[in-house]
Structure formats: C-alpha cells, structure tokens
C-alpha cells in the first residue's frame, strides 16, 4: 500500500522529529510559517538553533530527496528563519540549516514503518 504525497510528507516529518529527539535534539517548533513559506522543524542541538528541512520520498526513482532542496528553497528557508529570529527569538544564538532526507522502505496499514534517514548538518548557509 502506498501513501498520498501529503500523508507521506507528514509521516516523514514525524519520523525526522522522532529521529532528532533520539539524537538528543530538543524540538522548539514544528511547521513554522511565515507568509507563504514554512520551516519543517526548529530544534536545539546543544546550544545551536537548527532550522531543519525534511524531504521524504517513497523511492529514489525520480531523484534523491536532498536534490529537492534547491537554491530557491534554501533562500525561502533562510528568509523564514530570519523572520523567526526577529519575531520570536530575541537573543543572540548560533544557528545552522540542516536537511533530513527520509526514504521510505516499508508501510503497514498505510503508515510509514521502515525508512532510511540521512541527516546533513550545515547543509547550506545564509549569506
């Protein structure tokens, strides 16, 4: 059984959040929106604030999930992160931009059960 793309993406974000928690991250916010843009996960890794983009794919037949984080997408994430920092986080802090790729390997009753995770820290930088 396969999933519709929206469900797959949501379940991939849930899997990424759980994976980050297991690695010791503290989730600050999920699905932070600013105007038309969104950051999937905002988390603390020790004393670093991480803006995490999650890309989930059912297969890599049409490309690896990391390929979907284009330069344009990076600009949108950076713009949204700046808005978050200005409006909601009023102290100076180290930040970074990470990408988590989730590749589905198995489903059970319409739920993502098995998957591979690839976490790229400092995947891109703000200029």
Swiss-Prot record:
InterPro entries: Restrct_endonuc-II-like (IPR011335), tRNA_endonuc-like_dom_sf (IPR011856), UPF0102_YraN-like (IPR003509). It holds the Pfam family UPF0102. GO terms for molecular function: nucleic acid binding. SUPFAM superfamilies: Restriction endonuclease-like. Belongs to the UPF0102 family. HAMAP family: UPF0102. This is UPF0102 protein Paes_0016. It comes from Prosthecochloris aestuarii (strain DSM 271 / SK 413).
């Amino acid at each position: 059984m396969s999933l519709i793309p929206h469900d797959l993406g949501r379940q991939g974000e849930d899997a990424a959040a759980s994976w980050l928690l297991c690695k010791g991250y503290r989730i600050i916010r999920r699905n932070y929106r600013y105007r038309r843009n969104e950051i999937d996960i905002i988390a603390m890794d020790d004393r670093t604030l991480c803006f995490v983009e999650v890309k989930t794919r059912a297969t890599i037949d049409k490309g690896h999930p990391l390929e979907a984080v284009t330069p344009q997408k990076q600009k949108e994430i950076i713009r949204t992160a700046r808005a978050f920092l200005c409006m909601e986080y009023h102290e100076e802090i180290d930040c970074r931009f990470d990408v988590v790729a989730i590749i589905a390997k198995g489903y059970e009753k319409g739920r993502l059960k098995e998957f591979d995770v690839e976490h790229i820290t400092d995947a891109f930088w703000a200029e």
